[in-house]
């Protein structure tokens, strides 16, 4: 099937749900070659200026979920994640925001991998902080109960990714897997904040999230091509609440923040990003903290810990300034290594 799919994509034709499912099933089953996988991923990501279609994403996601380890957490978990592929090289905003949300009483199940098209992925950052990222499903549930946060290392829970992981790294640009990662969290989140790299994806991925069981969430796109709620531009948001959708545009100024440049939010190596995370959770002020407050504030609102995003931002600041967020990080490190 993959050969026929590549020809179809090269001819700028969209795949149906069933075709996308069949191809991803072959890839995840190890039935294709590395060359075919690279050709498929490259062709699919460049087929259209509007990125992959909803059917292509949903079909690929369904096949990938079937090949993954699923974890029964017994609780409504939350995930904050960006698709990556925005080439912004920002520090780990989602990871830092996740720690604040966990300190605020949410059950946060992060799901990620090492960097594919950036310098430092979620796994790289957490590892540099001292977190043991190689955890069993049982240990992850323990972490959720004791700390409020766990990390599902994609390599461990999506073992079939071994067929495409090295290829993603070699290609160095975003592929459909940037979208699929956030849609295939082993903990099946009931709440999610998903940042995307393309404005076209905002409403379609909100619909996909609902079909996957998300009750409350947001799909966000920073208008400066950032896969987070942006501090350097307005952000398009599609909010999900029990099956309904509402699309709005927000700006940093709406919440009393000054705009910054994307350069102000740049990160670096895993070690450099780990220091940034600790500095922010330790109370350091500045644009990076503000970016975390915006994203953590939205998270706390989604999780029902605040009645509005504005209240969520105020709560996020209180959590950091009280030392609870840093305590949560240290507890995550301790329990993950015990």
From Swiss-Prot:
GO terms, molecular function: anthranilate phosphoribosyltransferase activity; magnesium ion binding
**This enzyme's EC code(s):** 2.4.2.18
Which pathway is this protein engaged in? Amino-acid biosynthesis; L-tryptophan biosynthesis; L-tryptophan from chorismate: step 2/5
Kindly indicate where the leader peptide sits in this chain. Answer: none
- Kindly list the positions annotated as binding anthranilate 2: 168
Protein name per UniProt: Anthranilate phosphoribosyltransferase
Q: What is the lineage of its organism?
A: Bacteria, Bacillati, Bacillota, Clostridia, Lachnospirales
Where does the chain bind Mg(2+) 1? 94, 228
Family annotation (PANTHER family): ANTHRANILATE PHOSPHORIBOSYLTRANSFERASE (PTHR43285:SF2)
The biological process GO terms on file are: L-tryptophan biosynthetic process
What species was this sequence derived from?
A: Agathobacter rectalis (strain ATCC 33656 / DSM 3377 / JCM 17463 / KCTC 5835 / VPI 0990)
| Co-factor binding details | Binds 2 magnesium ions per monomer.
Q: Outline the subunit composition.
A: Homodimer.
Family, per the entry? Belongs to the anthranilate phosphoribosyltransferase family.
Question: Is Magnesium one of the keywords?
Answer: yes
Q: Which reaction does it catalyse?
A: N-(5-phospho-beta-D-ribosyl)anthranilate + diphosphate = 5-phospho-alpha-D-ribose 1-diphosphate + anthranilate
